[in-house]
């Protein structure tokens, strides 16, 4: 039986204290949780191996009390686990949970429960486990798809050797010129939808366009700036949550100013801030990577926004742009 030491390189260096959470229950420590996870695996012959991924195996992720335990049990039969009512209670008393594969199955979406099944659980002591049971054949392939995977237990040496966990798969990727041009074009083009939405005072539509369609282009552009400055050796995290590590405080504050409340004029302010920021950084990225930025397109997009911003509510036509 193989059990890889994981204390030193998975969760060392944590200085925070455990806290009292829901219902006054004391939050179990990392040591207690890891022991529980491995004890359950060692005492169940159906579980042949355990591996972990996510923030706890990422050396660059911040360490705090909200980190999930992203655990995979490699099992002889997944069905035996998801048909056993209350099995998940071995890990503690759940506050509430989600079962992604069960939900997909209920909604008629294609899923293969014989390969993988999961429970995402927040327990009453505040700990969260994202646990999946994977079949042996599925696990052998799955573990190779994420360089953050780290083997905690392998009773039969069935899993492939995994090097030291790294977040390299999530590093900012160097763009080519087509990536850059398409990202820029979609940013400026989709802003015309925001302009007419603001003129019509369709706030839900505007918010959706800004945050679901346009903002990702700005985040991508900022990630390229960060990539250039770090030789594309870092990750900015999901939704750019780690950008503040790499951007100057002034630039990061300007990015935060692109968020707005629901008031129309405040939304316009955030849009123009977003445009100025995108235009500035796009020119910088283009210069650094030897690309050509379509400034004519950007200027035209800005002109359209400014005209619509100044357009009266009773206007019967859009002024000529000639």
Regions found by a protein language model. Give the residues of each.
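Short hydrophobic alpha-helical segments enriched in small aliphatic residues
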Residues: 7-12
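Short, Lys/Arg-enriched N-terminal segments with co-localized hydrophobic residues
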Residues: 13-26
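Metal-dependent nucleotidyltransferase catalytic core
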Residues: 26-45, 53-64, 72-131
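Conserved NTP/Mg2+-binding pocket subregion across the NTase superfamily
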Residues: 91-211, 310-312, 316-322
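Conserved nucleotidyltransferase catalytic core and NTase-mimicking acidic/glycine-rich helix/loop elements
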Residues: 171-322
């Amino acid at each position: 039986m193989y059990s890889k030491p994981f204390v030193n390189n998975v969760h060392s260096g944590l200085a925070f204290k455990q806290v009292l959470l829901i219902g006054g229950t004391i939050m179990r420590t990392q040591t207690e949780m890891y022991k529980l996870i491995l004890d359950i695996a060692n005492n169940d012959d159906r579980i042949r191996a355990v591996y972990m991924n996510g923030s706890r195996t990422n050396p660059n992720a911040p360490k705090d009390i909200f980190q999930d335990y992203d655990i995979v049990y490699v099992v002889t039969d997944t069905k035996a686990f998801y048909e056993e009512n209350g099995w998940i209670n071995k890990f503690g008393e759940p506050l509430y949970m989600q079962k992604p594969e069960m939900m997909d199955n209920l909604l008629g979406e294609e899923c293969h429960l014989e390969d993988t099944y999961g429970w995402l659980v927040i327990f009453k002591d505040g700990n969260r486990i994202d646990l999946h049971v994977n079949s042996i054949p599925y696990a052998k392939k799955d573990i190779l798809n994420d360089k953050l995977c780290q083997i905690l237990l392998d009773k039969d040496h069935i899993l492939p050797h995994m090097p030291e966990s790294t977040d390299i798969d999530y590093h900012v990727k160097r763009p080519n010129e087509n990536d850059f041009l398409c990202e820029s074009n979609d940013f400026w083009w989709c802003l015309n939808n925001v302009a007419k939405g603001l003129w019509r005072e369709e706030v839900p539509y505007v918010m959706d366009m800004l945050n679901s369609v346009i903002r990702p282009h700005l985040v991508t552009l900022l990630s390229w700036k960060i990539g250039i400055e770090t030789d594309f050796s870092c990750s900015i995290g999901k939704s750019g949550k780690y950008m503040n590590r790499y951007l100057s405080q002034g630039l990061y504050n300007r990015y935060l100013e692109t968020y707005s409340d629901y008031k129309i004029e405040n939304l316009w302010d955030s849009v123009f801030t977003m445009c100025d920021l995108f235009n500035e950084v796009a020119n910088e990225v283009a210069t650094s990577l030897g690309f050509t930025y379509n400034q004519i397109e950007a200027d035209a997009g800005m002109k359209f926004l400014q005209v619509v911003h100044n357009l009266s509510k009773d206007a019967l036509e859009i002024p000529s742009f000639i």
